[in-house]
Amino acid sequence: MAEKDVLLMGSAIRTPKAFQAISAADIRLEQTLCGLIRWIRDTSVGTIVLCDGTRPDYDFSRIETFAKEHGKTLEVLLFEKKNDQYETRGKSYGEGQVLEYAIGHSAHLKPGGTFYKVTGRTFIENFDAIKTLHAKDDAVFIGPASVMMPKDTPKDVFGRRSVWTQFYKCGVDFFSKHLLKAYVDTNDTTNPIECEYFKRLQRVPHTRFAIKPFIVGRNGGLDLPYDADFTENDKALARTFL
């Protein structure tokens, strides 16, 4: 039976400094653990898939045990991204590689299922409310649904229309058909993944989140909090897993 509402966390714990303001692997690992702990402890998510394309040197067995103790399943997928294109095209291409690997290798992301994709090192404070509101929806994004007026459409730093890729909901079938290969047409300089998703979503039915997701964590490119940062208690608990 296909699983519904799996959480897919895309991750890059070891990342080139040129791509991110937060590039130190130890800091990125701590932030990843902060996110995992909150997802495991504080939401109704039953299955979490963490997929990292940088093959970090870390033993995830303790956090997997923590998940089991809370009645959750944590699947960890680690691989090494193909760096030839990743290094020239940027993190958009790398993000796409991670998602493609997860869809192709996870035991929980199967046809007929649905998942919430979240950027690694982040947590959605109001996730359970969002999950309830969108239980019957197959594709939900922060922009750009067709009902949006142009003035409401999210834009990137260069003013290009885009969707947020930090957090969205997708059916596995929907994603495989419409977005799985979007990354091959991306380049951080001229066409980041947020803009490529925008173009592709214009052609297919989808909806917007009924309430704004409250994102906890720090933007890796800017080293600034989203809506809030993890608390000192979150960070202290995460360090016990290091």
Range-by-range predicted roles:
Residues 1-242:
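ER/Golgi luminal nucleotide-sugar-dependent glycosyltransferases, focusing on the catalytic module
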